[in-house]
Swiss-Prot record:
Protein keywords: Host cell membrane, Host membrane, Host-virus interaction, Lipid-binding, Membrane, Viral envelope protein, Viral matrix protein, Virion
Pfam families: Matrix_Paramyxo_C, Matrix_Paramyxo_N
Entry keyword Membrane: yes
Keyword Secreted (UniProt): no
Annotated source species: Measles virus (strain Edmonston) (MeV)
Protein's name according to its UniProt entry: Matrix protein
Family the UniProt entry places it in: Belongs to the morbillivirus/respirovirus/rubulavirus M protein family.
Subcellular location: Virion; Host cell membrane
Amino acid sequence: MTEIYDFDKSAWDIKGSIAPIQPTTYSDGRLVPQVRVIDPGLGDRKDECFMYMFLLGVVEDSDPLGPPIGRAFGSLPLGVGRSTAKPEKLLKEATELDIVVRRTAGLNEKLVFYNNTPLTLLTPWRKVLTTGSVFNANQVCSAVNLIPLDTPQRFRVVYMSITRLSDNGYYTVPRRMLEFRSVNAVAFNLLVTLRIDKAIGPGKIIDNTEQLPEATFMVHIGNFRRKKSEVYSADYCKMKIEKMGLVFALGGIGGTSLHIRSTGKMSKTLHAQLGFKKTLCYPLMDINEDLNRLLWRSRCKIVRIQAVLQPSVPQEFRIYDDVIINDDQGLFKVL
């Protein structure tokens, strides 16, 4: 049985939206570089220099003899760095990077990025830029099927998204608990509804996604479980949720991310499940990569957040992350 509880909009009305990146072009049709700064926190961190950087741009042919052919729109998550430089100067250096892109495959299709340009202001992000990085292609590229193998490719940075990490403490991405199941437990999930205003202008390139007025995604927070064999009632779980004093915001981790902060009292069991942290981050890059790509340059705002209380999936139910399901005869083996 599923029970749904609506949060009051005051829980996200301050930081629950992201401004769009409106594409503008030069006279020759090239996109004008832009930077967007997002601050989803409450501003209680003493040192305000920590930030997460996310680059957006065009994957194009690296041909010095003619105008480059744009293949797809792509992104490069650089991660967290510490810098006092102005966003505009960081953007300028990013647009001067010579980032090579290569298409390859592992468990799934991958994109390999590595930079050949010396770093100055972007030195805090040298781990990704100088040693190279490999990403799931569908997470960082709008149309990986259009990227050729016989023509050298480069990633030309056009947009930069900076997320200031102004909350005190650590940001937890509770990956270990997302598949946790327990007997006689109630799963606490969130259903988030976003209103989307897609940024489309004269600089529009390959993009197969369609404009959606609203979109939803779901995240798992944790489980409410009693020590005995009984199960908590939905009303009791709702009371525990209300006591948590949850505040929501949108950030730019991995593209678009949901940030949650508990300002109230959290149950000891749930607090332990979340690594004893009260500041959580759920990147859409991991949760819903298709929606995340749609939101790369879009204006979006939270219009509804609902707590969804469901019975925890029984432990005997197997989770199949692969399309191959072994039969009892062992006729199909996975190496």
